[in-house]
Amino acid sequence: MNMFIRRIHLWLSVPLGLIVCIICLSGATMVFDSEITESLNPSIYKVERPEGAVPLQPSQIVEKVHRQLSDTVEVSSMEFSADPERACMLSIKGAEKKSLSVNQYTGEVNGWTESPQFFQTMRKLHRWLLDPPASKGATSVGKVIVGITTLVMVALLITGLVIWFPRTRKMLGNRLKVAFGKGTRRLIYDCHVTLGFYATIFLLLMALTGLTWSFGWYRSLFYDVFGASASSGTATANVSRPSGEKEEKDGQKEFDYSVWNNVLAQLKQEYSEYKSISLEAAQAKVSLPGNMPRTDTAKFNPESGKITGYSLYSQTPRSDKMKGWIYSFHTGSWGGIITKIIQFIAALIGFILPLSGYYMWWKRTSRKRKNAAPRTAGK
């Protein structure tokens, strides 16, 4: 039985091992993409808070942005962080994939946020092998290959764990540590066996959550296992303009941004602690403290700005929470910086495992050929 499992482990790993390397390495590079991006662009994400200064009202910020850019610029949302030294972020209609950074104390435009090309390439490599689908929800050859490889990776991790399981206490001691100073071959073997064991649970977590983006049938099954429905998420209307309007412009009515002033004041009074508050056309979202994504939504009267009701995260159906949970566990953000570091190391080990496996397979086959040569010559 053990020999059969070893053969399954080998036959699955040889053809797809290099793709596993690509998926794991590209995933490792993205663990700290937001931290690296922000550290490379401090003027975009950080502002200096003058002593005794208070942030401008949302309507004042919009007015100053219009003066610097154009009065035709349409602000669709505005995000204020609880960190007084973090810039205010504006979403502009027509610029969906980036935000406009503004100093909330002066109204000065800092510039646009934009993910570095390196991380964009790594994301495409990680998810689609540089072959992204033509549209959201569509499929592509690269997406299918990544999905199949991830399924195989799950099988490799499980069979590898079965093979690792020691028969004696001495074997257990050897398989829990890496032996340095005993040659390259032993070091590579220990890296494959020992480091692979320590990283297995984290690699399985990444693979099992990552598959939800590859296959619809798997996503439905995954949700069912946790008592949720993949298709029962509450649809939220995308309202671009509420009825609290003023002057007409090109046949449409302009949103009165002063409404946001009242909404923001109420939310700051209601929530003593929060990560950020995002103001939108007909609702506001309050991101709650913690590593897991948790958001309360407030509906407000678009004419007066008075909050009329809340949709609390604690009362949200499990099916609506699943996407945030899956992302947090896949990226390692669920436990903060510590779990992200662990996830990064585990992904690097995932990159090393196929390479060390190829090395051991090559050494084993080379030895068999050498042993077979004298027997052939003797005949």
Language model regions located:
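Conserved histidines in hydrophobic membrane contexts and catalytic metal-binding motifs
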Residues: M1-K379
